Amino acid sequence: MEGIKVLAKQFGKIKTPQGLAVAIALITAIAWFPDGLAGFLPSLKSNPFQAIIGAILTILGLSIIFFLHKKLRRGQKDSIIAEFGFIVLTLIFSLIVFNDFAITQFITSSLVFFSAWLHVREMEIVDYTVREVRPSNVKATVIFLSSAKYDEKFKKLMEKVEEIPTINDFFDFLEKEKMRLPWEMQLRLINEFSRSLKYVYVIGSVNSSSGSFEQIEDFKLIVNKFFPQIEVIKYREGLDFENLEKNFGVLKEIYSELKTKGLKEREIIIDTTGGQKIQSIAGALYSTAYDRFFAYVSTNSKSVKVFDVVPTE
């Protein structure tokens, strides 16, 4: 099923007549090969001479395709055109020489599959460009919460929160008191999109004695104080922040949940500032799909940067 989804997506990338012709040839080959093979095998008994000629022609054709691919190739397009032209000539020749259409199907589909395999194995499968964007309607952000150090300064800060009127005053207080709060950058991200933001989905860690899962309520208290219109959603369990596969799976689960709330993928941002480097990797990887974004808040300039990872041809 996953393979069918990938194949279907590729048809949206066909932009040239040559590409369409190749796609049609491949689809035809997929349909022809089972019928051709089913007809070719019995002919080994009923008409062995014709079957042997067909087999020789197939082997010769595969050799010529390989030669065209390696020797006449100044670029991928040149190679595809030459190979495609040879396959068409072979198809016409087979139709003229053989009375058995199954042999023609077998020969032609074999050549198409071999040509496709030669090109696919040399393709640069993953190639991306990254561009900075400015989404206008961000409704949710997914945050991997960093662990805060529960010391006297932190206790003093939490006691002060209710007395501080605005989020900007809160940032000023941190600077004045020279306090390093690991949640500051994530709060700046929330502040950046607070006009449209509806949900902050928070994931905590349990991979150390100072995991952030138990600290989510304190983070929620700060968010509720300065952004009462935003709903903070706590992921049901703490994660091992060093387990990339688990982190990736949770992002997929959270996106599905947010979409049930009516959000579109382009309205969700993954924060890659918090947590560990594993979370940055997971967030960046997951955002490579169309219409997904990830954000990073600079610890130097404290500016919010949002990136769109775009697959290129």
Swiss-Prot record:
GO terms for cellular component: plasma membrane. It is a multi-pass membrane protein. Its main location: membrane. The chain crosses the membrane at residues 19-41, 51-68, 81-103. Keywords: Cell membrane, Membrane, Transmembrane, Transmembrane helix. It is found in: Cell membrane. This is Uncharacterized protein aq_376.
